[in-house]
From Swiss-Prot:
The lineage of its organism: Archaea, Methanobacteriati, Thermoplasmatota, Thermoplasmata, Thermoplasmatales. Its cofactor is Zn(2+). This is Glycerol-1-phosphate dehydrogenase [NAD(P)+]. GO terms for cellular component: cytoplasm. Pfam families: Fe-ADH_2. It comes from Thermoplasma acidophilum (strain ATCC 25905 / DSM 1728 / JCM 9062 / NBRC 15155 / AMRC-C165). Pathway: Membrane lipid metabolism; glycerophospholipid metabolism.
Length: 352
C-alpha cells in the first residue's frame, strides 16, 4: 500500500525566556509582521504591567499599535474584538496577559490568518505556548484551534510579579500531562486513536521535570518562574507535534471543565486540573498519592471544601465529565459513573 500519511506542524520561531527580555518584542515583530500595523489584546491590569511597554516600544519603531482591552475569554468578547478590528489592516496580533487574554489573541490571529506573538504575564497554564484556545459559552469551555505563537516572549522579571497562586497553578497544569498521556494511550489501545510517541514523551518529560524539582518552586523566586515556564513551553510544543491537545488534556481537564460548567468560579484552571489529576491517576490505578503530595508542596489544596464547593457539585462533575467531549475517550469511559463509585473515589482521594 502506498504511504500517504501527512502532517503539518507549526512551532514558535522566536522564543525569549528570562530576565528583562520584553524589549525583544521589537525584533520578533520586525521579523514576522506583514506590515507596520499591530494589534495588542490585553486586560486592564496586564496592559499596565507589560502591554503599555510593548505599545511604546513598537510605536517608537514606527508601528501603528491598536489596543483592545478584553475581559473574560468567551465568544462574546471574541466577536466584539473581531468586529471592532475589521477595518484594521493588521500585520500581527500580540497577546499580553494571562491565559484568557492570550487565548483571545491566538483565536483572533487564527481567524484573521495573522502571525501571533504570546507575551505572558503569568505562568498560569500551558495555553501561553500552545495552538489551542479555550473559550467559554454559557459557562462551558470549548477547546478551539488557535494560532501557534510565531514568537513567545516570557519575561520572568514581569511574571514574578503575579501572585504565587498563578505559578503553582501553572506547575499543576504541566503535571496534569501525566494523566492526559495515560488517557491518550488508553484511547490509542482501546479505540485506535492516532498516537504520537514523540509528543507523548515530550509532554511526560515536561511534567516529570516539574515533579522532580517541586521543592525548588518557591514564592518570590524568579528562578521558579523560569523552571515552570520553560516546561509550559515544552508542553505547548508537544501539542504542536500532536496536532491536538491530547498531550496536555485528558480526563483531568474534562473534570475541570465540568466544574466550570457547574458554576465554579473561584478556582484557577490549574487548581481544577490538580484536583482532576489526582482522581484520574486514582482511576488509572497509578501513584496518585505522589501527585497529591506534589500539589501539597506547591500549596495547592485538592479538597473541594477549601474552595467552598459543595460535595454534590464535585460528585456530579466526576460522574458526567465524560460528556463534555464525548469524542475524547478517557479513563472516565463513555457513560455516567455510578453515584457510589464517584463518592468512593472522591472520598478515598480526599477531594470530598
Amino acid at each position: 500500500m502506498e504511504f500517504q500519511k501527512f502532517r503539518t506542524m507549526h512551532f514558535p520561531r522566536d522564543v525569549y525566556i528570562g530576565h528583562d527580555v520584553l524589549e525583544h518584542i521589537v525584533d520578533v515583530v520586525g521579523e514576522n509582521s506583514r506590515n507596520k500595523n499591530a494589534i495588542i489584546v490585553s486586560g486592564d491590569l496586564t496592559y499596565e504591567l507589560a502591554g503599555r511597554k510593548v505599545h511604546d516600544l513598537l510605536s517608537t519603531y514606527g508601528y501603528e499599535v491598536h489596543v483592545f482591552l478584553a475581559g473574560n475569554a468567551n465568544y462574546d468578547t471574541l466577536e466584539r474584538i473581531e468586529y471592532e478590528s475589521l477595518d484594521i489592516q493588521a500585520g500581527i496580533v500580540i497577546g499580553v496577559g494571562g491565559g484568557a487574554k492570550i487565548d483571545l489573541a491566538k483565536k483572533l490571529a487564527f481567524d484573521r490568518k495573522l502571525p501571533f506573538v504570546s507575551v505572558p504575564t503569568a505562568p498560569s497554564h500551558d495555553g501561553i505556548a500552545s495552538p489551542r484556545a479555550s473559550l467559554r459559552r454559557n459557562g462551558i469551555s470549548y477547546s478551539e484551534e488557535g494560532a501557534m505563537p510565531i514568537g513567545v516572549i516570557a519575561d520572568t522579571a514581569i511574571m514574578i510579579k503575579a501572585p504565587y497562586r498563578y505559578l503553582a497553578a501553572g506547575a499543576a497544569d504541566v503535571i496534569s500531562n501525566l494523566s492526559a498521556v495515560k488517557d491518550w494511550k488508553l484511547a490509542h489501545r482501546l479505540k485506535g486513536e492516532e498516537f504520537s510517541s514523540s509528543a507523548a514523551a515530550m509532554s511526560e518529560y515536561s511534567a516529570q521535570e516539574v515533579l522532580s524539582q517541586i521543592n525548588e518552586i518557591k514564592k518570590y523566586e524568579e528562578s521558579s518562574v523560569w523552571l515552570v515556564t520553560k516546561n509550559i513551553l515544552a508542553s505547548g510544543t508537544a501539542m504542536a507535534i500532536a496536532g491536538n491537545s491530547r498531550p496536555g488534556s485528558g480526563s483531568e481537564h474534562l473534570f475541570a471543565h465540568a466544574l466550570e460548567a457547574a458554576g465554579v468560579e473561584n478556582m484557577l484552571h490549574g487548581e481544577m486540573c490538580a484536583m482532576g489529576t489526582v482522581i484520574s491517576m486514582y482511576l488509572h490505578d497509578e501513584n496518585w498519592q505522589q501527585i497529591k503530595e506534589a500539589f501539597d508542596n506547591l500549596g495547592i489544596s485538592i479538597r473541594s471544601r477549601d474552595y467552598g464547593i459543595e460535595d454534590e457539585i464535585v460528585i456530579n462533575a466526576l460522574r458526567t465529565a465524560h460528556a463534555i467531549r464525548p469524542e475524547r475517550y478517557t479513563i472516565l469511559g463513555e457513560s455516567d459513573m455510578s453515584y457510589d463509585a464517584a463518592v468512593k473515589a472522591l472520598e478515598l482521594t480526599g477531594i470530598i
